[in-house]
């Protein structure tokens, strides 16, 4: 039993080492410029170990993007009270913006991720984190009749579009930082327009 636990720990450790190493390389050089050999070398594992964990580099990119969202989600979750729908929607956006501005140089650009893993995979991963939280809050506000009678899918797509816009423009860090207050004010105004008074 102890041997099995040790194997599981090694498996997880190797997996995480590959993801961490790949994420660093993808950020530094871009997805296309990084080889599996380079990732394996940085992770201090064999190429065989790479293929034991991942079918290909694309699958590893998905894992890296998921890890990126986990980090963003953890940051937001520790700073946001998710029980109050309206303030949670504001807070999630503000803290997301803060995280992107503060950690911009350590993020894989969404423009590199989406063409490789595809929109469906990107959306599936996103639904586990920020997108899922926003959707759950919108559903709750609809159930509580706090939102105007708009189609729930339209509302969810528009609200999540704000986050996608920030992700797409993350590389324009100076513009994001300089106009942060305007982004927040416009977003709040948009939220207010949705309230069923």
Swiss-Prot record:
Molecular function terms, GO-annotated: DNA binding
DNA-binding region: 35-54
Secretion signal span: none
InterPro entries assigned to the protein according to its UniProt record, in alphabetical order: DNA-bd_HTH_TetR-type_CS, Homeodomain-like_sf, HTH-type_Tx_Regulator, HTH_TetR
Record keyword DNA damage present: no
Residue stretches making up the HTH tetR-type domain: 12-72
Domain of life: Bacteria
Annotated Gene3D superfamilies: Tetracycline Repressor, domain 2 (1.10.357.10)
SUPFAM superfamilies in the cross-refs: Homeodomain-like
Keywords of the record: DNA-binding, Transcription, Transcription regulation, Transposable element
Keyword Transcription among record annotations: yes
Protein name according to UniProt: Transposon Tn10 TetC protein
Organism: Escherichia coli
Encoding gene (name): tetC
């Amino acid at each position: 039993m102890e041997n099995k636990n040790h194997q599981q720990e090694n498996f997880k450790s190797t997996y995480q080492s590959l993801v961490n190493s790949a994420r660093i390389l993808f950020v530094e050089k871009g997805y296309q410029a990084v080889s599996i050999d380079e990732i394996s070398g940085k992770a201090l594992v064999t190429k065989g170990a790479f293929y034991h964990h991942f079918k290909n580099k694309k699958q590893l990119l998905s894992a890296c993007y998921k890890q990126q969202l986990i980090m963003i989600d953890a940051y937001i979750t520790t700073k946001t009270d998710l029980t109050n729908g309206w303030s949670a929607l504001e807070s999630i956006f503000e803290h997301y913006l803060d995280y992107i501005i503060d950690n911009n140089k350590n993020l894989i650009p969404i423009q590199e991720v989406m063409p490789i893993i595809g929109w469906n995979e990107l959306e599936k991963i996103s639904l586990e984190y920020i997108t899922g939280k926003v959707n759950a809050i919108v559903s709750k506000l609809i159930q509580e009749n706090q939102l105007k009678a708009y189609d729930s899918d339209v509302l969810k797509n528009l609200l999540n579009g704000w986050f996608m816009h920030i992700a797409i423009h993350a590389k324009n860090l100076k513009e994001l930082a300089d106009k942060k207050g305007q982004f927040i004010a416009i977003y709040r105004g948009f939220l207010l327009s949705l309230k069923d008074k």
